[in-house]
Structures are given as C-alpha cells and as structure tokens.
C-alpha cells in the first residue's frame, strides 16, 4: 500500500538506505482499435494469470476500445484454453492462491453476473480458474482495490484521450 510504502521510505531515508518500492495498484492494459488482438490477448493472459495473478507486475484490468472488445474477450478465452487447457483447475501447472484469507477476499470480488469466462473455484485447493469479468465499472468491488489474483475485469472506452485522462485522475 502507499501508506506502508511511505513509512518504509521514511525509515530508510533516516539511514540513507537505498530502497525500491512496489506499491501495488490498479495497473491497466489499454487496447485500442489499432492493436493486434491476438498478440494483445496472448500477452494479457500470460501476464495476468502467471502465478494466478499473484505477481506485482500483473495487469489489474483491461480498458478496451468498445469496437474491439468482443474480439479481445473471445481471443482471451482462446488463450486461456491454449495456456491452461479446458479445465485449468485440473492442470498441474496452474497454481493456487497463497492462503485462505486471500482466497476468500478474491471470491468476494467476483460478481457472478459479470463473469464471461472462468469463475470456477475449489476452496479445498484454494484455486480460482482464470476469470474474465465484462461490463465492469469503477463502482464494482473488483475495481476498488488491487486484485492480486486471477480475476480480469474488462471495461470499454470510446475515446483514448478520455480514458488516459480518467486513469490518470484515479489513484493507482
């Protein structure tokens, strides 16, 4: 969190200790109508679902031009199948959520009415299938904090300049 990062930086500064801070946040992928959809989908799926989204560099959500959103979502579904198989939870190479507390928090972020891929979980194994949520807004629970898990919200835009401005106005 930014609050903890400020505290760590203040203590490090007292002793001139060099530090690098990764403060988490809501890091979006922006896909406009000029993007190579297949390449974008492959990279987004790899980055998001590597280690079940539990990496500090994982994309947090996708902001996609409305005109290519359906194609992107369809291609991301294909990439999930290609990278993890038809049943990711049965794939020995697909990971688990770090602990039960984090698993429960993630499950609470999933709105079943917005799930277009995945959404399946196994509480005994602490696994959540790669999940894509569509028709997401900034008011949804999944957009209120860093996800740090295998849940990918998709939002659309009509103006690239407007979306960049909107992202820059929000806390990251």
Q: Residues of each region from the PLM?
A:
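Conserved donor-binding loops in enzymes that form glycosidic bonds
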Residues: 96, 152-153
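ALDH superfamily catalytic-core signature
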Residues: 2-137, 159-161, 165-168
């Amino acid at each position: 969190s930014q609050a903890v990062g400020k505290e760590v930086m203040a203590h490090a500064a007292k002793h001139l200790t060099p530090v690098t801070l990764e403060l988490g946040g809501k890091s979006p992928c922006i896909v406009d109508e000029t993007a190579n959809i297949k390449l974008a989908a492959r990279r987004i799926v790899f980055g998001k679902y590597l280690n079940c989204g539990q990496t500090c560099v994982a994309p947090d959500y996708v902001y996609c031009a409305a005109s290519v959103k359906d194609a992107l979502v369809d291609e991301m579904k294909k990439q999930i199948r290609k990278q993890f198989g038809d049943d990711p939870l049965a794939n020995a190479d697909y990971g688990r959520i770090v602990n039960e507390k984090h698993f429960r928090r993630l499950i609470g972020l999933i709105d079943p009415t917005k799930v277009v891929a995945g959404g399946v979980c196994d509480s005994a194994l602490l696994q959540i299938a790669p999940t894509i949520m569509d028709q997401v807004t900034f008011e949804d629970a999944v957009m209120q904090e860093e996800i740090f898990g295998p849940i990918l919200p998709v939002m659309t835009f009509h103006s690239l300049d407007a979306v960049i401005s909107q992202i820059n106005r929000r806390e990251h």
